[in-house]
Structures are given as structure tokens and as C-alpha cells.
Amino acid sequence: MSNINVLIVEGNNPKDSEVFIKAAKASCAENLKNIVLKLEPRTNVKIINPANDNETKEALENMDRYNGIIFTGGAMRLNDMTAEIKKHITFAANCFKHSNKILAICWGLQVCSAA
């Protein structure tokens, strides 16, 4: 079996990630990466945060490399509709233009639904 390439989309902003790291010893995306690697150790995992324009640009330019995309949970609220939340929604909308399989968890599902 060939390697699987997965893109994990972090659902927390840096401040919320710090709280998560204190509680769980890793970010939401890192914890999810560890689970994926336990299930399939040969998986290549890339983690991005949609608030980082350079990361999203690179991910979208290389979308054909990924077998799947996972949108993690997070602590943000769609009703707040901050600039960062809008970037998450825009990134998800752009992901739907490609044929990748998508798994969206909690916050990630809200973002994908809004996209």
C-alpha cells in the first residue's frame, strides 16, 4: 500500500491552542495527527491553520497531493464571524472545489456547513 497524504486543518486560534496544549499536551491538530499515525503509521500529515495566509495558499496550490482533509474541532464560535473565522470558511469553500475526501469534526463541521 502506498503512503496516504492527509491535510489537517487546525480549528483553534493560537490563544485557544495554548489552552488546549496545557490541558492535552498537544494542539488539537497534533492530537489528531497522533491518532492518524497510530492507525496508519505510513501516513504523511501536514497541519495548517487557515488564519495563516501562506499556509492556506500553499495547501490550495498542492491540493492534488492530499488523499483527504480533516477539519478539527475548536473553540471559536461561528456567530462571532471574526476575520479569522471568515478565513476558515473561505478555506473550506476552496477545498470543496477539489475532489478530496473531507472529514469535519465539531467546529470543522460548522465551518464546512457555513462554506
Residue ranges and their predicted role:
Residues 1-90, 94-98:
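N-terminal beta1-alpha1 cap of cysteine-dependent amidohydrolase-like domains
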Residues 96-115:
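Catalytic nucleophile loop
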